[in-house]
């Protein structure tokens, strides 16, 4: 019985989702351990920004092959199923935000964001299981998020002026993140046409809902970044 139990624990720990949540926890623990050992003051906000930045860059690493596939096969990537890397991309992005909900204090904006983009859009992406989700997450969370959250971390550590971060994020949003969300939506339109013509209305509804949220997210946070920069500039 003990051997069977140990085998079960071993198999569970080797499952992708456990591996990824463990990695997120380990990154966070190393940050806490370092500051505790060397008695360095820190804020949970700075801790979250750095964790978010690191995990976002992990998302970029695993998403890059799917991004290439989507661009090279834009007419049919919406129906290409998840591969091992796609699962990692989804798990890291999804679990990071669950981790945020459990271990950090959320703002009202965080709650809205997590409800729409994690609770709803995350579920839709899981039901679709298309590599198109990797393309979306590359732009939604991956590269622009990895850069900006590191800049926000530097701001919290008084290594960078807030106005500089806001200016750089406005540029990232306008010329990379928002266009990337539009590109993802445009590529996904091929699937809408296909599913409608072939009467696959369940898939059609899932895809329309997912693409709508991706498009909205890109443009909404583009607007928010500009508003924030303008307020800081005045």
Regions found by a protein language model. Give the residues of each.
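Multipass alpha-helical transmembrane domains of eukaryotic endomembrane proteins
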Residues: 48-199, 228-230
